[in-house]
């Protein structure tokens, strides 16, 4: 479900350029079918991909101090859906509200419990 495979050890050569092409293909295929499509966690390529995707999904940007990287989506008037698992709401919600992220805390078991900002 992540669109940043090039940042991981894959066992075969996968470059940032390959990832850009793949991500754009996914966005094009979704749009051809009348679907909205979200970019999940590929923070490094957001500047190149914000025009191709309709929204962003992020896990743990507050924990890793990366939430500001999602700002191009907000500036383009596109939603950012964000979840934290270990960081308390009192820590990440002020950041999320300042950046205008739609944020919540979830448990890792991903049951029904949630605590939105």
Where are these regions (language model features)?
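Glycan-processing catalytic domains of CAZymes
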Residues: 1-117
